[in-house]
Amino acid sequence: MSHRQGDGADYVADEYETEELDDSDDSDGRDLYSSDSDIDDYMLRNLVYSTSKHDVYLMSHFSVIHWSSLTSTRTEVLNVSGHVAPREKHPGSLLEGFTHTQVSTLAVKDKLLVAGGFHGELICKHLDKPGVCFCSRTTCDDNAITNAIEIYNTASGVLHFIVSNNDSGVRDFDLENFQLSKHFRFPWPVNHTSVSPDGKLLIIVGDNPKGILVDSTSGTVVAPLRGHVDYSFASAWHPDGSTFATGNQDKTCRIWDIRNLSKSVTALKGNLGAIRSIQYTSDGRYMAMAEPADFIHVFDVKSGYEVEQEIDFFGEVSGVSFSPDTESLFIGVWDRTYGSLLEFGRRHNYSYLDTII
């Protein structure tokens, strides 16, 4: 594994140092990705979520696993290899549940986990309660892969989650009663949707070179996003709510400013493949973009994305996630030999005066 920085990288005081958790020894928690776990080429690699600098959730086989870096222990949270059925009754919930669900994406926030499947399945679970609370099939379409899920708080503080699906639909669910609140349809499969920090706008990207900015209430297109030349797989808002990023199969991540959408601010280039996942730190200082395999790029946003740390390893990327406090970066790696969960810690340089204070 190597970590390479671009010109001026010595200026970056806060880089990410790594601890590798792999299959190479028998100590607890080292086999987070064993050799028979499965990632298909068309999975969009959103299978790792951090809820604190010590807690991360990820897929291993047919299980959602919680890994604690504080205690070096792993705990199975949800197993979908057999039959899963909801314990609670909600309108629209499939009481018969699902059997042998292949999870394509997941999201975790505020003690709630939502997993999406290859056939439109949605499985919701409260992390502090046993069993599953809600099961639903979003679509019976033949092309029903659940591509991405994002859990967010509305302006009124209500918890919702939004689902991007290969049937060209974007669906918004209220998590208080697990009811569908909005359903927007588009002319192409939707690979990813991101909700703006104020909840008013959506970035919609999919099997079209042109992404769109959409009003979150009406689904009306606010502006097209022109610049990519292939299909897009990822998107993310900067916490400032004015800038955002889109990742594409053309091997670039484009940065946009809503105050001038006639062209992107810049295009950041990958090395070998599509940009499959994008994450900003909660303070907006850094942005990570993931390629399908071998490379994660961490950019210093404050430098205008000029300063980059390149993380180089062996294996396919199953997901990337910053912890909410920005102190940790987790990378899921699938490989028959080197499968692992990588944890990076943010490096801080403090002056003598800072130490006294």
Descriptions of predicted regions:
Residues 1-39, 43, 55:
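Long, intrinsically disordered, low-complexity acidic/Ser/Thr/Pro-rich regions
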Residues 36-208, 212-214, 224-226, 269, ...:
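WD40 beta-propeller repeat fold
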Residues 56, 249, 259, 279-280, ...:
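C-terminal amphipathic alpha-helical segment
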Residues 168, 179, 200-201, 209, ...:
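Glycine-centered loop/turn positions within well-structured domains
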Residues 175, 196, 216, 238, ...:
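Short, acidic, Ser/Thr-enriched surface-loop or helix-capping motifs
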Residues 192-193, 230-239, 273-282, 317-324:
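Beta-rich, blade/repeat-based domains predominating
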Residues 204-207, 211-268:
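Aromatic-anchored, glycine/proline-accented short structural segments
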Residues 273-298:
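Loop/turn-rich, solvent-exposed surfaces of beta-rich toroidal or solenoidal domains
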